[in-house]
Curated annotation (Swiss-Prot):
Family: Belongs to the conotoxin O3 superfamily.
UniProt xrefs under InterPro entries: Conotoxin
Top-rank lineage group of the source organism: Eukaryota
GO cellular component, one term: extracellular region
Name of protein: Conotoxin VnMSGL-0111
Tissue specificity: Expressed by the venom duct.
Length: 75
């Protein structure tokens, strides 16, 4: 193999490694966001239960400091 062929192969290898590393980072960020949404969505307090009970609904969590009251929660 000539020096040029080795350089081209090395460059291709580096590009493929960099691309796969970026894809992995995006997947990690997506998983982290999904976990954060899950944690926020299950935040419930006694005040939320009481508030929703007055409306004959179920407390499904708190968003922006306000209770989320619906007929039934979807998990």
């Amino acid at each position: 193999m000539s020096g040029l062929e080795i350089m081209v192969l090395t460059l291709l290898l580096l590009v493929s490694m960099a691309t796969s590393h970026q894809d992995g980072g995006e997947k990690q960020a997506t998983q982290r966001d999904a976990i954060n949404v899950r944690r926020r969505s299950i935040t419930r307090t006694e005040a939320c239960y009481e508030y929703c009970k007055e409306q004959n609904k179920t407390c499904c969590g708190i968003s922006n400091g306000r209770p989320i009251c619906v007929g039934g929660c979807i998990r």
